[in-house]
């Protein structure tokens, strides 16, 4: 009934879709197995992509040849570049999306790939022979052979939904949980744990009073995620709105605490620290008089609204009473209550940096199964697992991105070397090379890698080379352009910058704070003519290069030093217990995690700089 597939992907959420698309586009014959083909690529929580650090990840996925950026652009209803008031390392693209268009667009992208087959059924087990996965077993007992497997189970592994004192099995509201895989993996020697996440109620937008809320419009000149010509920026957008909780809301919520599964101890799993439930917020931050609520439309042509900031597992009657005390929500009609969900995950220290498991060869994990939270975090893991599952099926060397190359590299390195006790989400602060890892240069960093492995297209590669050439050419032209005091001083003084007394190179003026080439182009014909041939993206790239070159140089030097440690390979079979000079914790952690390089060893929690020095001495370095 089934051929032997190169790659079988279990689960069709954000991670599974990226994994299937990547492996298929690289030439693998792929089977994407899902319990329900009507729920492929669901936005289970908020209808948005990107945000701080997450937007950089979406652009990195796109630069490598993944599809999340294209799908996000095609389903976008609003675009905002966050943190524009800060330096470019902090700029983060974010979109509001049409939930149904997003899922539909993902399905269209997958169905357009001849190498992807679909199968609708629960996968209940793996076929493992001699320590290597060689197929999957379905709930009906069908065995499907393959060379590698990617597990992207999301919140479905033994999922339990909590609403007040009610508890029901499920991986998402209205969908059953997945069973069998956790139990088999534990039998094989894997360690498992439980995590929790939650979602807010959805309400009828027709019942809200937006006049008392603060409107939050999209950017005046919206950008997009994808570097591809397949997508265009929005010409019209839908607004979001901001309102706040108040003391009456808090008091009403507190009335339900005795029936809250979080406070009564029925929920054992840890929830996401940076996306707490509303009851957790008012309990932990009792001194705060109000908490911000973002009112987000679910799409172009729907009245359904997502109440961002009001995630809860309190009883539905308490949710209803409390939500109606928020300004603008006095007459709110609820479509469905919020809920919490508990699910199995597997501590990611059981993985290699390729996302292949240490215990079972050619078996890869991606997404929430690894303890992460967020669509973007899941999608990038799916992309890397799909790439490496394809490579494993073909007996090729795995692709591993460095911390200095991508936020994706930071995320996977953190998971594998440090593990996580709570749902992990990405922040710019987690990256030590964030000036190198900007959202504007993801294509310059990663498209050459995507092209080399056969994922990014020739057209994308040539577009990247053209952008690189043109932005470098513009920087050189700026360095060779001199500007007279009588031309420059008016512009300088208008923008609070000291005047000049003699001809100055434009490059030096643009290094000053608040000085942009566009300010000079508005008033100086020569400079207007200079930048006219270039795209906005090329101009922005050149300006970042002009202003931040000194900082970029410093980070590149730091990254080079770390690369030297990364190039010092460690024997995976080395016996660390015999080096008594190492701390006991270092011996235990190094023996368990078996780092591939000295650089990886240096980032393991519990391994200190003294331990690394001892290893270097032992290696004769």
Swiss-Prot record:
Keyword Repeat attached: no
Cofactor(s) required for function per UniProt: FAD
Quaternary data: Homodimer. Heterotetramer of two MnmE and two MnmG subunits.
Encoding gene, per UniProt annotation: mnmG
UniProt binding sites for NAD(+): 271-285
SUPFAM superfamilies assigned to the protein according to its UniProt record, in alphabetical order: FAD/NAD(P)-binding domain (SSF51905)
GO molecular function: flavin adenine dinucleotide binding
GO cellular component, one term: cytosol
UniProt record, GO biological process: tRNA methylation; tRNA wobble uridine modification
Gene3D superfamilies the UniProt entry points to: FAD/NAD(P)-binding domain, GidA associated domain, C-terminal subdomain, tRNA uridine 5-carboxymethylaminomethyl modification enzyme MnmG/GidA
InterPro entries assigned to the protein according to its UniProt record, in alphabetical order: FAD/NAD-bd_sf, GIDA_C_N, MnmG, MnmG-rel, MnmG-rel_CS, MnmG_C, MnmG_C_subdom, MnmG_C_subdom_sf
Binding site for FAD: 11-16
Designated name of the protein: tRNA uridine 5-carboxymethylaminomethyl modification enzyme MnmG
Annotated function: NAD-binding protein involved in the addition of a carboxymethylaminomethyl (cmnm) group at the wobble position (U34) of certain tRNAs, forming tRNA-cmnm(5)s(2)U34.
């Amino acid at each position: 009934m089934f051929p032997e597939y190169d790659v079988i992907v279990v689960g069709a959420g954000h991670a599974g879709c990226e994994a299937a698309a990547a492996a298929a586009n690289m030439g693998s014959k792929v089977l994407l197995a899902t319990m329900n083909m009507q729920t492929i690529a669901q936005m289970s929580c908020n209808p948005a992509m990107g945000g701080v650090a997450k937007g950089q990840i979406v652009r990195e996925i796109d630069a490598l040849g993944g599809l999340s950026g294209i799908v996000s652009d095609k389903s976008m209803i609003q675009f905002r570049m966050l943190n524009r008031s800060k330096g470019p390392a902090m700029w983060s693209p974010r979109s509001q999306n049409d939930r149904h268009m997003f899922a539909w667009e993902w399905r269209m992208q997958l169905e357009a790939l001849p190498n992807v087959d679909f199968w609708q059924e629960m996968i209940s087990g793996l076929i493992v022979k001699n320590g290597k996965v060689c197929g999957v077993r379905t709930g009906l007992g069908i065995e499907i052979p393959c060379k590698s497997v990617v597990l992207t189970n999301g919140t479905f592994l033994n999922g339990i939904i909590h609403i007040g004192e009610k508890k029901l099995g499920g991986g998402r509201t209205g969908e059953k949980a997945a069973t069998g895989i956790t139990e088999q993996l534990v039998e094989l020697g894997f360690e498992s744990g439980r995590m929790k996440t939650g979602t807010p109620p959805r309400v009828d937008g027709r019942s809200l009073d937006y006049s008392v809320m603060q409107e939050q419009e999209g950017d005046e000149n919206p950008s997009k995620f994808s570097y591809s010509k397949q997508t265009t920026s929005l010409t019209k957008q839908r607004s979001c709105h901001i309102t706040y909780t108040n003391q009456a809301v808090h008091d009403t919520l507190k009335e339900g605490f005795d029936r809250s599964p979080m406070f009564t101890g029925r929920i054992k799993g840890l929830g996401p620290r940076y996306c707490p439930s509303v009851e957790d917020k008012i309990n932990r931050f009792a001194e705060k008089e109000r908490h911000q609520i973002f009112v987000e439309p679910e799409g172009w042509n729907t009245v359904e609204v997502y109440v961002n900031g009001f995630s809860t597992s309190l009883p539905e009657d308490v949710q209803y009473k409390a939500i109606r005390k928020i300004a603008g929500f006095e007459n709110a009609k609820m479509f469905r209550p919020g809920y919490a969900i508990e699910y199995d995950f597997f501590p990611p220290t059981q993985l290699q940096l390729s996302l292949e498991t240490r215990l079972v060869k050619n078996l890869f994990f991606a997404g929430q199964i690894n303890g992460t939270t967020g669509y973007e975090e899941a999608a990038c893991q799916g992309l890397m697992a799909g790439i490496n599952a394809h490579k494993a099926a073909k007996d090729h060397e795995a692709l591993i991105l460095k911390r200095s190359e991508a936020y994706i590299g930071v995320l996977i390195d953190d998971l594998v070397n440090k593990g996580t006790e709570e749902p992990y989400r990405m922040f710019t602060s987690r990256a030590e090379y964030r000036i190198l890892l900007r959202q504007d240069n993801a294509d310059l960093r990663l498209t050459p890698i995507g092209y080399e492995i056969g994922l990014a297209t020739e057209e994308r590669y040539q577009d990247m080379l053209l952008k690189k050439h043109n932005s470098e050419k513009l920087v050189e032209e700026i360095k060779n352009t001199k500007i007279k005091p009588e031309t420059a001083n008016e512009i300088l003084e208008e923008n609070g910058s000291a005047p000049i007394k003699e001809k100055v190179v434009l490059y030096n003026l643009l290094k000053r704070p608040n000085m942009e080439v566009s300010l000079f182009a508005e008033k100086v014909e020569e400079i207007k003519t200079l930048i006219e041939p270039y795209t906005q993206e090329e101009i922005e790239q050149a300006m970042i290069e002009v202003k931040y070159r000194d900082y970029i140089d410093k980070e590149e030097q730091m990254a080079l030093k770390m690369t030297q440690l990364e190039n010092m390979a460690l024997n995976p079979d080395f016996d660390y217990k015999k080096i008594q000079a190492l701390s006991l914790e270092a011996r235990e952690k190094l023996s368990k995690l078996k780092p591939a390089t000295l650089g990886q060893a240096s980032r393991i929690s519990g391994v200190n700089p003294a331990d690394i020095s001892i290893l270097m001495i032992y290696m004769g370095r």
